[in-house]
Structure formats: structure tokens, C-alpha cells
Swiss-Prot record:
It comes from the Bacteria. Belongs to the DNA glycosylase MPG family. It holds the Pfam family Pur_DNA_glyco. It comes from Staphylococcus aureus (strain NCTC 8325 / PS 47). InterPro entries: Formyl_transferase-like_C_sf, MPG, MPG_sf. Its EC number is 3.2.2.-. One of its GO terms (biological process) is base-excision repair. One of its GO terms (molecular function) is alkylbase DNA N-glycosylase activity. Keywords: DNA damage, DNA repair, Hydrolase. This is Putative 3-methyladenine DNA glycosylase.
Length: 202
């Protein structure tokens, strides 16, 4: 997948259904991306790169597309895939995963079962046992990788405003969150909107 030359919003959509693999020292975790958010850098008031601000915590966001930008929010580790050329702080937040391999270990790591295991940006990273130290690594050149060949394809994609970013003017309401329609592993899904996971893919 080209993380440098494509539009960040298109990358966020294209990532839906892509297989994520994390290889721990003793365990392999896999799953399929069902929810993403695009962050558009310098002009995006909700983005960590808004206005070109650079601090030690966001250094990875300014690296070349395909870099992993990992940051902690309210004790939860959030994983972003950096997009664009070096120096342009855009990226895609991976918000939720439909789990596949390593379920028993995920249950232990999270202390939860069912859809709660991976239906949020800090939930799936804990389920996959991903460490903060992965920040700045290059996707597919470290323990975290994606598989764009053995992937799934959503039947429908929904675009909606991003989660948890009030008071950012127009950027609060822009539809930059992308979800696999009806997939129960999407965060904040109403039960009435849920479908069986297998029915949400082509």
C-alpha cells in the first residue's frame, strides 16, 4: 500500500479490511481493520501536527509515510499509520479491529470477551499487547505489519465525524471517520445497527 502518494482520506478508506499482524515474542495476533480516522496535518485543528507544531512526542508523525506513530492518551496506546512524505504530519488512526488469530491471548490481555476485546483504539492495542516502544518503527519492518493481499473488502463504508474532538470548528464535523457498515467490532456501535461480522464483508 502506498502511504506516500495517495490522499490520506483515501488511505483511511483503503485500510478497511486490511489484515493487521503483530508478532509478539511468543504469540501472533491478527485481525482486520474495521474503523479508521484520517488526520490531515497542518490545517486540521484536531491533528497533532496542526500548525506544524513539533514536540518530542510527535516526532514520528513527521516521518515518511508507513512509519508508525504511537502515542498515549488517557493511559491507552493509540496507533497511527503516517501518510505523505517526510515533513508532512498526516496520518490514519486505527480505531478498531475484527480479531482473528490469538483470541485467547487477547481475552487475557484485555480481561474482556466478545466485541469489547478490540472495539476501540486503545482496546485493540492492549489486546494485541503492543508496546509504546513501537513508535517510530516502520510498518512491515518491525513486529507490526499489514497484509494487503490476504484481506477482506467491506460491503459498505460509512463516513462520519471523528470521535471525541469537540470545539475544533468545522473540523469537529468533517466526515473523516470511516467504518465497515454494521460490523459489531466498530466502536460505539448501537446494537440495533450491528450485523454478523461475516455479513459485513463482500
Amino acid at each position: 500500500m502506498d502511504f506516500v502518494n495517495n490522499d490520506t482520506r483515501q488511505i483511511a478508506k483503503n485500510l478497511l479490511g486490511v489484515k493487521v499482524i503483530y508478532q509478539d515474542t511468543t504469540q501472533t495476533y491478527t485481525g482486520y481493520i474495521v474503523e479508521t480516522e484520517a488526520y490531515l496535518g497542518l490545517n486540521d485543528r484536531a491533528a497533532h501536527g496542526y500548525g506544524g507544531k513539533i514536540t518530542p512526542k510527535v516526532t514520528s508523525l513527521y516521518k515518511r509515510g508507513g512509519t508508525i506513530y504511537a502515542h498515549v492518551m488517557h493511559t491507552h496506546l493509540l496507533i497511527n499509520f503516517v501518510t505523505k512524505s517526510e515533513g508532512i504530519p498526516e496520518g490514519v488512526l486505527i480505531r478498531a479491529i475484527e480479531p482473528e488469530e490469538g483470541l485467547s491471548a487477547m481475552f487475557r490481555n484485555r480481561g474482556k470477551k466478545g466485541y469489547e476485546v478490540t472495539n476501540g483504539p486503545g482496546k485493540w492495542t492492549k489486546a494485541f499487547n503492543i508496546p509504546r516502544a513501537i513508535d517510530g518503527a516502520t510498518l512491515n519492518d518491525c513486529r507490526l505489519s499489514i497484509d494487503t493481499k490476504n484481506r477482506k473488502y467491506p460491503k459498505d463504508i460509512i463516513a462520519s465525524p471523528r470521535i471525541g474532538i469537540p470545539n475544533k470548528g468545522d473540523w469537529t464535523h468533517k466526515s473523516l471517520r470511516y467504518t465497515v457498515k454494521g460490523n459489531p467490532f466498530v466502536s460505539r456501535m448501537r446494537k440495533s445497527d450491528c450485523m454478523f461480522p461475516e455479513d459485513t464483508w463482500k
